[in-house]
Amino acid sequence: MPVLLTRDLGVTLADGERRFTLRVPELALEPGEAAGLTGASGTGKTMLLELLGLLRRPEAGGRLLVGTGAEARDLVPLWSARGGRSRLAAARGRLFGFVPQSGGLMPFLTVAQNVALGQRISGSEDAARAAALIARLGLGPVAGLRPDRLSIGQRQRVSIARALAHGPRIVIADEPTAALDPEAAAEAMALLIGTAAATGAAVLVSSHDHDLLDRFALTRHRLVPEARDGHVVSTLRTGAEAAA
């Protein structure tokens, strides 16, 4: 049973006579599933992650259901509901974890404080869970250091721990290994997927590294653009369509 399900989700951006439309006919993520998002530069991968993560407003008419069974809720109507923005922010902080390309760590906080930050924001502080993630990701020896004392690979591991510390249902990772060498990229991907699976969170990873996605057997989704008289429409293809 999916923890995230979309139906006809989309958004259009206009710049003079030029328009770009992102279309997501359907996307389903199961609890514990690891999925990869691919597509050429400019096809809207980051925009899609923003839509799913409640960071960008979709067009009316689409659906974005988060949760399983009877607890599943369509979050699209909150964009236009009274008080909806605060409810969206609360849902985003509670249901989603984010791993950005750069790590996105607070430079004035230690590793342990950065990991606990998501818990504080979502109101779900759990020191034991944060400590367990720090240990699992091999960050114990550097837990008291600030990000400027860490390697790039260590910073990404901190970002992974922070994204999972509050127990999100879905983790969204935007090119999380782009700044890493192949060995460090494989290590970070293994830690992200393995740790998320252990917590039951679904993971969607945007990446240009097809070989890395194949190595970890991620379910593949692909954005395919089509130009129509100055209007580019980028559509998400899933399953067999994504492999075509």
Residue spans for each PLM region:
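Short coil-to-helix segment of the ABC ATPase nucleotide-binding domain corresponding to the Q-loop/switch region
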Residues: 109-116
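Hydrophobic anchor residue at the start of the ABC signature
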Residues: 160
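Catalytic Walker B motif of ABC-type/P-loop ATPase nucleotide-binding domains
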Residues: 171-174
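Conserved ABC ATPase signature
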Residues: 146-150, 154-156
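Conserved ABC ATPase "signature" region
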Residues: 127-142
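ABC ATPase NBD coupling module
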Residues: 71-97
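Conserved catalytic motifs of ABC-family nucleotide-binding domains
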Residues: 167
